[in-house]
Amino acid sequence: YTCAAADGPTTTPVNAYNIYLQLIYDNAWGLVAAGTNRHNLKTGPGIPVAVIAELDRKVDDGLPYTGTFQFSLWASNGAAPAAPAATSCTTTAAVASTWNANNGNTNCGGSTLF
């Protein structure tokens, strides 16, 4: 891959669902306006909530807004995940939220914080 400002097939790797990943230093992860910039790797959207929830349980604490793996609204070449609600990836926009792992949503994403 060659570094460039715009995402593209020669500049950006994709996830298993053919959506671009993002390695960046920003605060666009977890709860909206997380505040602190961190190096992070975003999975991109398009991942089923059951898969992203299981990934979080395997590598972190299993909760979308705590730990080193958190929910992310970021989207590049895919549709952005829906904001927290009963039909979205997470139950609420609060630290105590959980993944909506059984609702069948197929458009979720996460971010690994470094």
Where in the sequence are the language-model features?
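Low-complexity, acidic interaction segments enriched in glycine
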Residues: 1-114
